[in-house]
């Protein structure tokens, strides 16, 4: 009987549609079947999970179905429990990107540079040790001049070691699609220098067993000098050349139109892309796809409220065609008020956000008044009135309950709930309590949208980006160049514009020419 009463209520709801006569006939047929076959006819109406209400929030409203309700109605079947949405696929692909092993590519370049640099640093020492180990007895004595060269060689090697560590052995923060041309050029130059010195050393020193040890020491010092000059060249090409601004980059996010302008120097396309991404995570607001959708009332608005069907014979088609054309013309002249609906939807959203914000601020202010930092002298002065002493974590959990509902409603209204979990809010609250921050400092993260870096996971790896360019990525920036950095859900389009040439003139003004005369009027008071 319960199922029958539920079914009757559902049928009563459906009877308010425009096609009520058809639904009433179907209801009578189903009702007769339900009396005959007892429970089997009842189960064919709807299936609810245990503990769930029969009618949801949408079904409790008035039935506003149109003539096309049979075509536009979505039926939830049992297979929907195992279906996967596009958002789930995007989230799964992001997790796969984050878990992909990029450590080998990340450290391959520094490892190769370190091995080559270590080989170059050990080469001068090998030049000095090999004669001492192989033909020490036949070497000519070298006194004070060699000792001075030893000191010079030691300090030069120390400077070369420290500068090489600071310049080349830094861990890379990105993996480039192509080799860095200048870095590869410098590595090839170092290898050629060292190989040439070893070849000359083998032909002129090792093979004839050179006895002039002072000349061998000078030869090693000359190699260190050459390595120092190569390092100066590397400093200019890798660190100094791009410091002078030469181009202006306009970066636009394709989804919401957020844009920024940056001035850069002479860079290749791939290095400019890395430079843009470094600033993107700190300058651009976080990408929130939930803010891009128009209100549902606008998206579901019908452009026309009728349909014209030609069901008559050939002799009656002329009148119906004329009437249909007149109705279509009237509908075309009807003014579309979607912009008005959008305006009022935006105004209503702003009002709701301000309302939720006010409630959240008041709730947080009241919650912060429930705790107080306990000083050591206060605890010792009032032993007769013991109070519960909590650590920052317990205090954060205690005061989070009064503000939880207001926080949840505010985040849901502003569509920020995917970026703030309950655990992250409690951790941030614990951080603010530990450092004696005010409620305004606690709310700053939620009231003001932060940059993209603020919402990155602490242990997450870098995101996978795809550089799309019509030019080779190793080419230099030039006027009118356009390239994009793509991800699964959006892209960054970068337009390159050279900075203008400034022609600055000069005009001299004599300081004695600054003279003034007071213009007196009848109303002037002096």
Curated annotation (Swiss-Prot):
Its main location: membrane. The chain crosses the membrane at residues 110-130, 149-169, 179-199, 216-236. Ubiquitously expressed at the 4-cell stage. In early somitogenesis, becomes more abundant in anterior neural tissue where expression is seen in the neural tube but not in the notochord. Keywords: Cell membrane, Developmental protein, Differentiation, Gastrulation, Membrane, Neurogenesis, Transmembrane, Transmembrane helix, Wnt signaling pathway. Residues 70-83 have a biased composition (Low complexity). InterPro entries: VANGL. It is found in: Cell membrane. Residues 15-33 have a biased composition (Basic residues). This is Vang-like protein 2. It comes from Danio rerio (Zebrafish).
